[in-house]
Amino acid sequence: MAQRFYDTRTAQIRDFEPLVPGEASVYYCGATVQGMPHVGHVRSAIVFDILIRWLEATGLRVTSVRNVTDIDDKILDRSAASHEAGFEASDLYPAREPWWALAYRFEKAFDAAYLALGVRRPTYEPRATGHVPEMFALIERLMERGHAYPAQDGSGDVYFDVRSWERYGELTRQRVEDMQDAPDADPRGKRDPHDFALWKGAKPGEPATAVWESPWGAGRPGWHLECSAMSTKYLGAEFDIHGGGLDLRFPHHENELAQSAAAGDGFARFWLHNGLVTYGGEKMSKSVGNTISPEEMLGMARPTAVRYFLGQAHYRSQLDYRPGALDEAEAVVERIEGFTARARAAGAVPPAPDGALADRVPAAFRTAMEDDLNVPQALAALHEAVRAGNSALAGQDLDAAAARLAEVEAMTAVLGLDDVPEGDDAAAGPVSDALDSLVRSQIEARAQARADKDWATADRIRDALAAAGVVVEDGADGATWRLAD
């Protein structure tokens, strides 16, 4: 059977034929790095990691892009709050933290979470702040085509004119009249309350480091514009797959599609959206207290079991967490690992790998993955192979056990279950990287405070690091750090 995916834009499961034979291009939305990653972020990353692994398993050469939104209202607001009198500083949110240091620190926290769960790095991981010229070019194309205009209030904002694009709403199948107003700027400068910001003029009190000069005045890019500019830079004007969480369909992806198509780009041929994570059947909410973080999950189960849990549902389905769910995932992973260990100990030797990875999995597994990435059915094939392998071992049929071992190892490779750091490897990798990134961000904030002659803040950062057992040593080439003896 041909590879098929559910395309959000057409609301149909369609045959997938890559734009370029033998290759595939995938863009999926990364994080706005304003805080620590939550399980929804990590589930989405695992979903698209499995997608990319499967496409590669079929023999395609995949170019993947996952962006980092490192300039945004939420990032600036959180940084601004840390400079206010009475701000209650903490280890997670220190006082007087520059916006760029905050964004970098949390970007590294996301990296650590991804690496801890075996999510491979994409081919490209561009930051929004590094692609402002590309955003200028996209705005200019939209203006030339009559789809964008400067704000009418002199604010320096630039808006996309939704009424000028008759296909606006095609991704989510909504009429403009039924949509919520765009909340991203003061509506007084808009022609229509649904128009959304492509460029946001600088506001009084905003840091100079968060402002770029543009043909329309100083300011910064809008969120939706960033993804359109970065995806097409690395993948071209038309590419195969655009992915992200279900919560991004509107307004983010709707606006991305509109501005890109209106600028003349073919843009994404397929739109894939993964379902959200709930807790006991309810939406996670800090106010209700029914949340769990990736860090907490990793404290309750091994990384491989956490990855299994977050990747086990159909990607379009809601994934529900409940107490005991990770214990169940741990037991399943142990059964898989138990079979592979017993098979090798018994002398079962799988045949040498030959051909594409997708050719070495059972037919039922391949059929499931080709059917809109049906991971639950693929896992059923994996568990059947484990059961058959255990039966072969019990009957001392090493040839059959070896054949099943080869299938199991091929399937776990596709699902990324064989690529999760465990034990000392896990501790030495993502955790140490995260610690280094966190400490360096504080050292950079201290250096900025010293440059500003803000000695109180510089001393406060130094003392906080010392209290945590970190020794900062100033040298001619800058500051370095080490753990206290």
UniProtKB/Swiss-Prot annotation:
Cofactor requirement: Zn(2+)
Biased composition (Basic and acidic residues): 185-197
An example Gene Ontology molecular-function term: zinc ion binding
Residue sites binding ATP per the record: 286
Superkingdom of origin organism: Bacteria
One GO CC term on file: cytosol
SUPFAM superfamilies: Anticodon-binding domain of a subclass of class I aminoacyl-tRNA synthetases (SSF47323), Nucleotidylyl transferase (SSF52374)
Binding sites annotated in the UniProt record for Zn(2+): 29, 227, 252, 256
GO biological process annotation, one example: cysteinyl-tRNA aminoacylation
Subunit structure and binding partners: Monomer.
Designated name of the protein: Cysteine--tRNA ligase
Species of provenance: Micrococcus luteus (strain ATCC 4698 / DSM 20030 / JCM 1464 / CCM 169 / CCUG 5858 / IAM 1056 / NBRC 3333 / NCIMB 9278 / NCTC 2665 / VKM Ac-2230) (Micrococcus lysodeikticus)
Phylogenetic classification of the source organism: Bacteria, Bacillati, Actinomycetota, Actinomycetes, Micrococcales
